Swiss-Prot record:
Keyword Ion transport: no
Annotated source species: Chlamydia abortus (strain DSM 27085 / S26/3)
CDD domains per the UniProt record, alphabetical: STKc_PknB_like
Role description: Together with the serine/threonine kinase Pkn1, may play a role in the specific interactions with host proteins during intracellular growth.
Protein name: Serine/threonine-protein kinase PknD
SMART domains per UniProt: S_TKc (SM00220)
One Pfam entry name: Pkinase
The encoding gene: pknD
Taxonomic classification: Bacteria, Pseudomonadati, Chlamydiota, Chlamydiia, Chlamydiales
One Gene Ontology MF term: ATP binding
Length: 933
């Protein structure tokens, strides 16, 4: 264990202890589990402990914590794993047991719907584990970790066993340790596992099997649905086999448990193993069926691909013209066919495609009925499927933009694929070979009408495209008639009919939905006519829903209005109000889905608000972001990560689903409502480095109130806490001095006052303070003070830190003082000339400023405009400003716009253009004050 710095203990079990540790070689925090010292001499227990580690190391699945290292060579036997922030399912269940009323956030966390999503992930993990020939044998809520970002992880593989092995009696006996303080913890000969979660046959001494794991899953699902046990075996009493278990819907009628789910639980808990599910896969399939709300479908029409009578028109198109975001060759021609018939309000399309057709790409669309033959076929929703190198990708497209994408490996020998596309209620889904690949929710009145097909060779569709109607669609919604008027842009007639529905269904779902659609109709009319009063009327229509059962729709509607008006602060504020106030209302899911939809929309249009919606999505719908999207997002964020001080000072890589990523997004977007939550989370974890990062971010964004309130809270917490654990990073008392220095910066105190405690501060804190101080004095025309600060600080940081973090500001100070000779000396002495033309390097910008100060302005413009126009580093945005194409304001985040104004301020100062320089200062102060998203 000498390779790790132990931070604190985070868990203790019968055989092992788990510590939070720091791995200095890989620069990351890990969870280190070691065998207890009082058990370390027992070879049998060592063998069992190592068996647990090796089983976990052999399993590769998101639901199993991977093992980094296993150490069995020394007296201290241990292994390491990733450290995941979260809590156990047991702690969540325990927090609500026997509670008469629950807070909103806890009620949401323990709702039937939320628990089913978690249980589905548990089943997926155990299905994989069983496929590897492993039995867990001790499934229970204690051994299920719920991560802060929707991770669901199975823990504790100490009882796990390969199905091919016979149960090792010696390994599975619990050995009492005479003389140990834990000598009474076990009884020799006890069956491995937890009695409350053991199948009846297991309690009678039968060997473990997949069926006994399924029984344990049944007990867990029973607890999730009812918030109670199906039975309890009391400690000290003889273990009994339950004869009868009361159905979940009878035990907890207030939970409104569907009969189908009760049947699922009772089947999993069947006393006779033969009556249980035959596999976890079968159990998971029933859960999926319920989650998807699978309807009964009836075939209605068959579209013959070779029959011209089935199609309104059939022609060739250049696909890249209409779908520029798809990975298709701009020169490839595709066949487009649009059906004569219009699809039903709830429809399922079934067809079989040859592999060759998918290798070229295949699209299925629901274009609007109007103007479909005038080039508007790409409007509305559709799916695009494409095979490349045995990877099948599925993209959801809307109005020509790819808004969601997923992919997966396929069998290299598979030649045919069965595809099913469903549109039901507000849900669009795509199934491939009876497996769900993508689901998307859309709660706005649909514009789809006909069915469109895009493919290179229509003969690659095997047989017909079968159109099926849902049994639920036989009941026509009262909203269908006004929806039809809305689709035809007959706004006034649609509004009239919607109002009649509101009057006819007061206090009912239909009435609230009609009121919401009145707002949509008014909004669409205002947008089409450019009527500002119309937008105000739409806001008033949505306000009618205030404090009703459908209250989330008020704020969703208002967010749509503000989005059209490009008032993004108000848009995000509306969505936040809905999420905070009405987290338990049924309609809140529509707000969450809209957040995810806006994220994809903003990303693909390269809009600055994408950072805010990424942050919101991480909070309210993290499960909606898949691994390929994570990779794409991280790739796009690399420039910002590189230019973020708290990232560059921490060499460990940043995970997408982490508190640090939330802070990064808050920093660049200027969106700070989640800072209090990050503060509390970091304090609970005693992560003092993260607390320093948070206060640096708040100070940089000018959040004086946050620093005052939470700075005082931090001071009180530190003074009231006794610190016993080993601290490997920033010390708590240093944070108190850091906060005092932040206050001094806000008050524009002298250099000596700000850095009066520099001798007791960690270098990271010193660099944070210097960065904040330097930017503040630069924009306020006091750049020379940077040199005074460097003189005070340079002995307290390493030479490398001085070069990386102090030197650029030193050069900026001399630029402010217009000492061109000194600037050139520093550039020549510290930066290789190759860096002067590398636009990702500080020297590129500094050299451009020097040219502006000492040479013709045209040379400065020419040099700076040589930056790359794609993926430009935030520190070099001045280069885009100098380029002929200029800056697109909508693309840049709050922090990028702020950086650009500071860069322009220095640039114009070097050019001697004091008027433009002062205009930049005014604009900078206004931006900081208003902080528009």
């Amino acid at each position: 264990m000498q390779h790790y710095d132990i931070i604190r203990m985070i868990g203790k079990g019968g055989m092992g202890e788990v510590y939070l540790a720091y791995d200095p070689i890989c620069s990351r925090k890990v969870a280190l589990k070691r065998i207890r010292e009082d058990l370390s001499d027992n070879e049998l227990l060592k063998k069992r402990f190592l068996r647990e580690a090796k089983i976990a190391a052999d399993l590769v699945h998101p639901g199993v914590v991977p093992v980094f290292t296993i150490c069995s060579d020394s007296d201290l036997v241990y292994y390491t794993m990733p450290y995941i922030e979260g809590y156990t399912l047991k702690s969540l269940l325990k927090s609500v047991w026997q509670c008469d009323s629950l807070p909103k956030d806890l009620a949401e966390q323990t709702s039937v719907g939320t628990f089913l999503s978690i249980f589905h992930k548990i089943c997926s993990t155990i299905e994989y584990v069983h496929s590897r020939g492993i039995l867990h044998r001790d499934l229970k809520p204690d051994n299920i970790l719920l991560g802060l970002f929707s991770e669901v992880v199975i823990l504790d593989w100490g009882a796990a066993l390969s199905k091919e092995m016979k149960e090792d009696v010696l390994l599975d006996l619990d050995i009492p340790m005479p003389g140990s303080m834990f000598s009474n913890m076990t009884v020799p000969g006890k069956i491995v596992g937890t009695p409350d979660y053991m199948a009846p046959e297991r309690l009678r001494g039968a060997p473990a099997s997949e069926s006994t794991d399924i029984y344990a899953l049944g007990v867990i699902l029973y607890q999730m649905l009812t918030l109670s046990f199906p039975y309890r075996n009391k400690k000290g009493k003889k273990i009994h086999v339950p004869n009868h278990i009361i159905s979940p819907e009878e035990v907890a009628p207030h939970r409104e448990i569907p009969s189908f789910l009760s049947q699922v639980v009772m089947r999993a808990l069947a006393t006779d193993p033969k009556e249980r599910y035959t596999s976890v896969q079968a159990l998971k399939a029933d859960i999926e069926q319920h989650l998807q709300g699978s309807p009964q479908w009836t075939p209605k029409i068959a579209l013959h691909t070779q029959d011209a009578e089935c199609w309104k028109f059939h022609e060739s198109i250049l696909l890249s013209k209409y779908f520029p975001m798809l990975e298709v060759s701009p020169a490839l021609w595709y066949s487009l066919a649009i059906s004569k018939i219009e699809s039903f309000s709830e429809v399922r399309l079934e067809y079989t495609l040859l592999r060759k057709g998918l290798e070229g790409g295949f699209g299925i669309l629901l274009p609007p009925s109007e103007n479909v033959d005038h080039g508007d076929f790409y409007r509305g929703y559709g799916f695009w499927l494409h095979i490349k190198k045995n990877v099948l990708s599925v993209s959801l497209v809307r109005n020509g933009l790819e808004i969601q994408k997923t992919s997966g490996n396929i069998d290299v020998n598979q030649e045919k694929f069965f595809i099913a596309f469903e549109k039901q209620n507000h849900r669009l889904s795509l199934n491939i070979d009876h497996t769900v690949w993508m689901i998307h929710m859309d709660y706005l009145p649909g514009r789809g009408g006909r069915i469109g097909v895009i493919i290179q060779d229509i003969t690659d569709v095997c047989g017909n495209i079968v159109v099926l109607e849902s049994s639920g669609a036989l009941h026509v919604s009262c909203l269908a008639v006004p929806d039809a008027f809305l689709n035809e842009k007959l706004y006034d007639r649609a509004i009239t009919f919607y109002r009649r529905i509101v009057e006819s269904f007061p206090g009912r779902k239909e009435g609230y939905e009609a009121q919401f659609r009145i707002g949509i109709a008014v909004l669409e009319k205002a947008a089409e006519e450019g009527d500002q009063e119309g937008f105000s009327q739409a806001l008033r229509e949505f306000s009618v829903l205030h404090d009703s059962v459908a209250a989330p729709l008020e704020y969703l509607g208002k967010a749509l209005v503000y989005q059209r008006l490009e008032e993004y602060n108000e848009e995000v504020k509306s969505l936040l109000l809905a999420l905070k106030r009405y987290g338990q209302r049924p309609e809140i899911s529509r707000v969450r889905d809209h957040v995810v939809d806006r994220l994809h929309e903003a990303l693909y249009s390269n809009h600055r608000v994408s950072l805010v919606f990424m942050l919101l999505a991480l909070h309210v719908a993290p499960e909606s972001i898949n691994s390929s999207e994570e990779e794409h997002f991280l790739k796009n964020l690399q420039g910002k990560i590189h230019d973020t001080l708290f990232c560059s000072l921490d060499i460990s890589p940043i995970d997408f689903r982490s508190s640090k990523m939330e802070l990064l997004l808050s920093y660049w977007s200027g969106f700070t409502p989640f800072l209090p939550g990050l503060f509390q989370r970091s304090w609970d974890l005693k992560d003092y480095r993260a607390l320093a990062d948070i206060f640096y971010t708040a100070a940089d964004l000018g959040e004086r109130e946050f620093i005052d309130v939470y700075g005082n809270t931090l001071r009180e917490n530190i003074q009231a806490t006794t610190f016993t654990e080993d601290i490997v990073e920033i010390f708590p008392h240093q944070l108190i001095h850091f906060l005092s220095a932040l206050d001094a910066i806000f008050l524009h105190a002298p250099v000596e006052k700000i850095f009066s405690d520099v001798d007791i501060l960690d270098p990271v804190l010193i660099i944070y303070l210097f960065d904040l101080f330097a930017k503040d004095v630069l924009i306020h025309g006091k750049g020379e003070q940077i040199l005074d600060a460097i003189q005070v600080l340079e002995t307290y940081v390493s030479p490398q830190q001085r070069h990386t973090y102090l030197l650029p500001y030193e050069i900026l100070a001399y630029l402010w003082m217009k000492e061109g000779k000194k600037v050139h000396e520093l550039l020549s002495a510290h930066y290789d000339e190759s860096f002067w033309i590398e636009d990702s390097h500080w020297a590129f910008v500094l050299y451009g400023y020097w040219l502006a100060l000492t040479e013709e302005s045209s040379l400065a413009y020419l040099h700076l405009s040589g930056c790359r126009e794609d993926h430009v580093a935030p520190r070099a945005l001045i280069g885009l400003f100098c380029s002929p194409l200029g800056i697109c304001e909508n693309q840049w985040s709050y922090q990028e716009r702020r950086n650009l104004l500071l860069q322009k301020f220095i640039f114009f100062h070097c050019l001697g253009d004091d008027v433009e320089r002062d205009n930049c200062r005014v604009a900078y102060d206004l931006l900081v004050k208003e902080r528009l998203l």
